[in-house]
Amino acid sequence: MSKNKLSKGQQRRVNANHQRRLKTSAEKADYDDNLFGEPAEGIVISRLGMHADVESADGEVHRCNIRRTIRSLVTGDRVVWRPGKAAAEGVNVKGIVEAVHERTSVLTRPDFYDGVKPIAANIDQIVIVSAILPELSLNIIDRYLVGCETLQVEPLIVLNKIDLLDDEGMDFVNEQMDIYRNIGYRVLMVSSHTQDGLKPLEEALTGRISIFAGQSGVGKSSLLNALLGLQNEILTNDVSNVSGLGQHTTTAARLYHFPHGGDVIDSPGVREFGLWHLEPEQITQGFVEFHDYLGHCKYRDCKHDADPGCAIREAVENGAIAETRFENYHRILESMAQVKTRKNFSDTDD
């Protein structure tokens, strides 16, 4: 997930792919303006290949074609669209998307072939869902937080399945979550099974477009089903009794409306995303508690590891930075280096 500009080589590949698509359809006439009504505002609730489902101001959903001049269209985009004139006469004629408004945010994921690929737009917050089962992974939480900081979208940490905790377990988990509360992150404890804690979560979702992110098996779909109501049920699979891991079942990204207000964009593509396309400096900036210490290390090229005079390591030793966060920072950097060894994401011929 990133707001970084593509490298020259990546941009060349994107442009080349775009030109090939244009060449294929060069001899096809674009849609006749006389077939469509007056322009109107709408929001893309799903992108389906060469078409998009657009919701109009009155809440109706219209299947639309997309002008060839529109190079990128994803769920959450605010658009100008026009209905097919024959639609008013009861004939099923697609509308057309004419233009896309400027995005306030773009969620992307790294792609080995096209650089970074946009998958959702205009997101206000990312709900990071974790759970005590199959495993409470602070490393996964930290990875998502780095993504949120890079995108500059507000995160909300939600710990699901608290009904499985006894008092001692709850104390331990609260101690772990205090690591995040103490550096300014919001944390909610909920149970999609008993619906404990759902009211504060509903309030946090109201008036915003959110996405739910997290590893498989933490109960994202069950939580969304509880929040959306059965009429909008998102498919889900129970966690495997053998592996303890869940399975993804939704496909294309789609925007849903919460009954209490607010929206969610859901799909496997927005639930899990990588960081390997980011630079190490971006990972460092993604740890908010590091900011006060950056620039104060003894050496300008400090790697914040075993370097002498490292201000961040000293803060860890003094208890000002949580040791688990510091360890996860280096785990993320190490995993990025391993992936980039297998696939060099950045171009070397520029």
From Swiss-Prot:
Per UniProt, where does Zn(2+) bind? C297, C302, H304, C310
> What cofactor does this one take?
Zn(2+)
Alphabetical UniProt keywords: Cytoplasm, GTP-binding, Hydrolase, Metal-binding, Nucleotide-binding, Ribosome biogenesis, RNA-binding, rRNA-binding, Zinc
Please name the InterPro entries in this protein's record: G_CP_dom, NA-bd_OB-fold, P-loop_NTPase, Ribosome_biogen_GTPase_RsgA, RsgA_GTPase_dom
E.C. code: 3.6.1.-
Biased amino acid composition, Polar residues = 1-17
For this record, an example GO cellular component is: cytoplasm
Report the residue ranges that make up the CP-type G domain in this protein.
104-273
Q: Relay the cofactor remark from the entry.
A: Binds 1 zinc ion per subunit.
Which cell locations does it reside in?
A: Cytoplasm
Name the predominant localization: cytoplasm
Q: Indicate the family of this protein.
A: Belongs to the TRAFAC class YlqF/YawG GTPase family. RsgA subfamily.
> What does the UniProt function comment say about this protein?
One of several proteins that assist in the late maturation steps of the functional core of the 30S ribosomal subunit. Helps release RbfA from mature subunits. May play a role in the assembly of ribosomal proteins into the subunit. Circularly permuted GTPase that catalyzes slow GTP hydrolysis, GTPase activity is stimulated by the 30S ribosomal subunit.
- Name of this chain's protein: Small ribosomal subunit biogenesis GTPase RsgA
Annotated organism of origin = Salmonella dublin (strain CT_02021853)
Q: What is the lineage of its organism?
A: Bacteria, Pseudomonadati, Pseudomonadota, Gammaproteobacteria, Enterobacterales
